[in-house]
Regions:
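Non-heme Fe(II) oxygenase metal-center motifs and adjacent flexible, charged/small-residue loops
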Residues: 1-216
């Protein structure tokens, strides 16, 4: 997408439906972006970003951290949630009130009124980093939605179906966009195409993504 086309996108908040139970709340958190990023800095000072290793032994291109009662971790033993940060050997930082309120309100806006996350995965993308198509299925209660908040550089989000080979929608996510999916779309495959280099007044050379989940 060229900058000319980017400039032509609507600047007021608007809702885009991806599938039943899945929407993008465009610009929903844009006005809070700097404050949200300040929370991210505080969290990752206590629980630094790191590149996790997949069960197959590959280093993920996206740097990760967590906050909440549990955090998502990966190593050669598998994917799982842990109450202890394996890097610091301490509990993860609590989800800040501002982040919690944003996640709950966005879920309600998308039609999920009972969402109360206990985990927030923080992903940091640099130029070239990506997230391959995958399902979020490590949570015990799949009736709860996923809430995903974008900060910083724009990225192309892929949202597919229940099978990996299903055709994917491609959506440009910019700062403050919030994707919410649940219900019949809860296990849909999704991912992020390689990030293009750029500069954000909020996050510098990075894209930050906050993914809120109810794990238990």
């Amino acid at each position: 997408m060229t900058m000319d086309l980017f400039d032509q996108l609507p600047h007021d908040p608007w809702i885009e439906t991806l599938a039943p139970g899945a929407v993008v709340l465009h610009h929903y958190a844009r006005q809070q972006a700097a404050l949200l990023f300040a929370d991210v800095i505080a969290i990752t000072t206590a629980a630094p970003f790191r590149h996790l290793i997949t069960p197959g032994g590959y280093r993920m291109s996206v740097a990760m951290s967590n906050c909440g009662q549990v955090g998502w971790v990966s190593d050669k033993q598998g994917y799982r949630y842990s109450s202890i940060d394996p890097l610091t050997e301490k509990s993860w930082p609590a989800i800040p009130a501002r982040l919690m309120t944003l996640a709950v309100d966005a879920a309600q806006q998308a039609g999920f009124s009972q969402f109360e996350p206990d985990a927030c995965l923080i992903n940091r993308y640099e130029a070239g980093a990506k997230l391959s198509l995958h399902q979020d299925k490590d949570e015990l209660d799949l009736r709860q939605p996923i809430v995903s908040v974008s900060l910083g550089l724009a990225a192309v989000f892929q949202f597919g179906g229940l099978a990996r080979e299903a055709k994917c929608l491609r959506v440009l996510l910019t700062e403050g966009d919030v994707v919410v999916w649940g219900g019949p779309s809860r296990l849909n495959y999704h991912g992020v195409l390689p990030l293009k280099a750029g500069f954000s007044a909020t996050t510098g050379a990075y894209r930050i993504n906050l993914t809120f989940r109810r794990t238990r």
